[in-house]
Amino acid sequence: MGINPTTSGPEVSSREKKNLGHIVQIIGPVLDVAFPPGKMPNIYNALVVKGRDTVGQQINVTCEVQQLLGNNRVRAVAMSATDGLMRGMEVIDTGTPLSVPVGGATLGRIFNVLGEPIDNLGPVDTRTTSPIHRSAPTFIQLDTKLSIFETGIKVVDLLAPYRRGGKIGLFGGAGVGKTVLIMELINNIAKAHGGVSVFGGVGERTREGNDLYMEMKESGVINEQNIAESKVALVYGQMNEPPGARMRVGLTALTMAEYFRDVNEQDVLLFIDNIFRFVQAGSEVSALLGRMPSAVGYQPTLSTEMGSLQERITSTKEGSITSIQAVYVPADDLTDPAPATTFAHLDATTVLSRGLAAKGIYPAVDPLDSTSTMLQPRIVGEEHYETAQRVKQTLQRYKELQDIIAILGLDELSEEDRLTVARARKIERFLSQPFFVAEVFTGSAGKYVGLVETIRGFNLILSGELDSLPEQAFYLVGNIDEATAKATNLEMESNLKK
């Protein structure tokens, strides 16, 4: 589906007579607005409330029409705080949906849901805007080629490889490293692939948004000296913002990514942190819009809302959007409707494990729970597929033996099982990796490991060639040569102590 960008911003349309209404009811972030008969705005039109509150402060609130109620009334959701709004205030129908700036001028800048820059670097130098509501590309426009997207992260590339132009979910509870993994992916992809990224911060912590921005400036993903050379545009609708903003900020980020794909014909990376907050924001306004809650209190339109966002994230013959979405899993319950609905749209899942994080193995990606539709011999090749399967079998056998080890001890195992356990523990540690973005608090230099090197390393462990090396030599290293060098250093240190 080609974008039809306009050359006017999201201002009020300049008709001879503006379509004016007035507020009749305010319930938190939801407004009811009455319009003259025959002048009702369309669904998804942007409405603007301008005026002054009781203490004389200027008010400028943008809302989006969600429902036509009858009796010449509409129900709209506000994109910013409704503090100071009063019944009777004048409301202007802009006549168009929310439109945001798109194109090269968005790179290196931070925007809110309305496409307004919020980084104090002045106005955005673009007259090209695009509406945030569009239909997904048609079947005939889709690209069906299958190819791997190398990330440089061993556990991901080997066991749950990402598809170029696919959708990937990062699953995990609070504090197991989703955002750090996303930052590492942005860093690696900008450096290794030279691609353009769009980051949508949906309902996450403001502090994390600030940290990410600073990290990007440090790593050169955002170029402070020459903003136009930057590789990422940032769109934030953080936790402190009303649900309307959090519900639509994902669409704002996606609209910017679609322009790079359809008009600039580029391969784009779209990061959404966190897709669960998109669902959560929808559920917050759903009851206020008068909808009956569904399972676990979620909105009845959950699947429709998720589908309208996800189906626009795809590859066309012009370019591709590869999307990596962090998915917060409430109470670590993968059957919760929010993560369960997200699963249906994904090509690969990267599941983060609290158990691995507790062991200090980072990235804490669960090698047995993480999946990918790309892990097939005809796509990745026989060697990659066989290596991945043998790694999974070894780790699965180790998992089965853990109860026996806990009760009877390692000595009660057969010789073959003891060897399996030793190799599995080395594999588990070799799946860890020092990150560029975590250098500050690990003290280890970050490592990017190519897929060929990754496969070679795991084949050497599985073949038994490295059985004599201590397992700590495999912890937080890049390729297998670093592990053997670390083993030599450990041996020298122990000899010196003697």
From Swiss-Prot:
It is a peripheral membrane protein. GO terms for biological process: proton motive force-driven mitochondrial ATP synthesis. ATP binds at residues 172-179. GO terms for molecular function: ATP binding; ATP hydrolysis activity; proton-transporting ATP synthase activity, rotational mechanism. It comes from the Eukaryota. PROSITE patterns: ATPASE_ALPHA_BETA. Transmembrane segments: none annotated. Keywords: ATP synthesis, ATP-binding, CF(1), Chloroplast, Hydrogen ion transport, Ion transport, Membrane, Nucleotide-binding, Plastid, Thylakoid, Translocase, Transport. GO terms for cellular component: chloroplast thylakoid membrane; mitochondrion; proton-transporting ATP synthase complex. InterPro entries: AAA+_ATPase, ATP-synt_VA_C, ATP_synth_F1_bsu, ATPase_a/bsu_AS, ATPase_alpha/beta_chains, ATPase_F1/V1/A1_a/bsu_N, ATPase_F1/V1/A1_a/bsu_N_sf, ATPase_F1/V1/A1_a/bsu_nucl-bd. Its main location: plastid. The gene is atpB. The lineage of its organism: Eukaryota, Viridiplantae, Streptophyta, Embryophyta, Tracheophyta. It is found in: Plastid, Chloroplast thylakoid membrane. Belongs to the ATPase alpha/beta chains family. Coiled coil: none annotated. Pfam families: ATP-synt_ab, ATP-synt_ab_N, ATP-synt_VA_C. Its EC number is 7.1.2.2. F-type ATPases have 2 components, CF(1) - the catalytic core - and CF(0) - the membrane proton channel. CF(1) has five subunits: alpha(3), beta(3), gamma(1), delta(1), epsilon(1). CF(0) has four main subunits: a(1), b(1), b'(1) and c(9-12). It is an enzyme of class 7 (translocase). This is ATP synthase subunit beta, chloroplastic. It catalyses: ATP + H2O + 4 H(+)(in) = ADP + phosphate + 5 H(+)(out). Produces ATP from ADP in the presence of a proton gradient across the membrane. The catalytic sites are hosted primarily by the beta subunits.
